[in-house]
Swiss-Prot record:
Its EC number is 2.1.3.2. It catalyses: carbamoyl phosphate + L-aspartate = N-carbamoyl-L-aspartate + phosphate + H(+). Belongs to the aspartate/ornithine carbamoyltransferase superfamily. ATCase family. This is Aspartate carbamoyltransferase catalytic subunit. Pathway: Pyrimidine metabolism; UMP biosynthesis via de novo pathway; (S)-dihydroorotate from bicarbonate: step 2/3. Catalyzes the condensation of carbamoyl phosphate and aspartate to form carbamoyl aspartate and inorganic phosphate, the committed step in the de novo pyrimidine nucleotide biosynthesis pathway. The keyword Transferase applies. GO terms for biological process: 'de novo' pyrimidine nucleobase biosynthetic process; 'de novo' UMP biosynthetic process; amino acid metabolic process. Heterododecamer (2C3:3R2) of six catalytic PyrB chains organized as two trimers (C3), and six regulatory PyrI chains organized as three dimers (R2).
Length: 317
């Protein structure tokens, strides 16, 4: 069995519902603990026992492969009993409300619930009805805190810092919980954030979040240290936000020509899943400047760190 972590960081919150509300100290503590798990996950023995005897329920109202499997693996490596609830075959499909589901689950005394929901704010509502800790695995276009944390860890490991870096977040900012959480985190940590998108994919008043706004890639990528592409989320679109996928790629898809607008040592990120040929070219996605595969690796480490940090607040921990 692997040794205990050196970090003694305790997150001063019962839940992780978003990046909003986290201090720079909180974020740094989670990233430092995550670093330990990066190294652990590269060893033969990846097990720890910090969640032994604890129950983790993964409740996903939206389909997910990466995030759900990452949380499942994280919980199991920490020794938790992990249960994945299938919404498609549950009482929710039979008309049970979100609050009814929360009350029912709470009666089973889970220690940690990992929840994804299509409605912004739904995870926070559920958290009010349960006794255990709740982790927001994505709620509508609101927040996705563990994605922002894993992105920050990836950047810090490759650039050595977050403060002072120019981060260009490009694409469907309007519908992206990843963009919102990253903006909040990066601003807190002193990065310079720029969003790049057509006007139809920019939230009204986005400047009030403390970001620069560019409406073309040449301007947006100029001097960027990190180019973070976002998926075009057609499932959240009820109108015509872009003329066509091919035209969108022509102006806002990341190819080698547009990447050259950024710094020569700029690195490329994408939260996945990627629409190749829509928001990013395969040559760039699979190229030497891409951190996309590393982001997946960092995801497991970050989720292990979050689970452990919250578990330290649980009764009898």
């Amino acid at each position: 069995m692997a040794t205990s972590p050196k970090s003694t960081f305790v997150l001063g919150h019962r839940h992780l519902l978003g990046i909003e509300g986290l201090s720079a100290h909180d974020i740094t503590g989670l990233l430092d603990l995550s670093e330990e798990y990066v190294e652990l996950n590269r060893q033969v023995d990846k097990k720890r026992t910090v969640l032994r005897g604890r129950t983790q329920v993964n409740l996903f109202f939206e389909a997910s492969t990466r995030t759900q499997s990452s949380f499942e693996l994280a919980g199991k490596r920490l020794g938790a009993d992990v249960m994945n609830m299938s919404v498609s075959s549950s009482s929710i499909k039979k008309g049970e409300t979100l609050m009814d589901t929360a009350v029912t689950l709470n009666a089973m005394h889970p220690d940690i619930l990992v929840v994804r929901h299509h409605a912004s704010g739904a995870v926070e509502l559920l958290a009010r009805k349960v006794d255990g800790s709740v982790i927001n695995a994505g709620d509508g276009a609101h927040e996705h805190p563990t994605q922002a944390l894993l992105d920050a860890l990836t950047i810090r490991r490759n650039k050595g810092r977050l403060e002072g870096l120019v981060i260009a977040i490009c694409g469907d900012v309007l519908h992206s919980r990843v963009a919102r959480s990253n903006i909040l985190l990066l601003n807190t940590m002193g990065a310079r954030v720029r969003v790049v998108a057509p006007s139809t994919l920019l939230p009204p008043g986005i400047e009030r979040m403390g970001v620069e706004v560019a409406r073309d890639m040449r301007e947006g990528l100029n001097g960027a240290d990190i180019v973070m592409m976002l998926r075009l989320q057609r499932e959240r679109m009820n109108g015509s936000f872009v003329p066509s996928s091919s035209e969108y790629f022509q102006y806002f898809g990341l190819d080698q020509k547009k990447l050259a607008y950024a710094k020569p040592d700029a690195l490329v990120m994408h939260p996945g899943p990627m629409n190749r040929g829509v928001e990013i070219d395969s040559i760039v996605a699979d190229g030497a400047q891409s951190l996309i595969r590393e982001q997946v690796e960092m995801g497991v480490a970050v989720r292990m760190a979050v689970l452990e940090a919250l578990a330290r607040n649980l009764p009898n921990a």
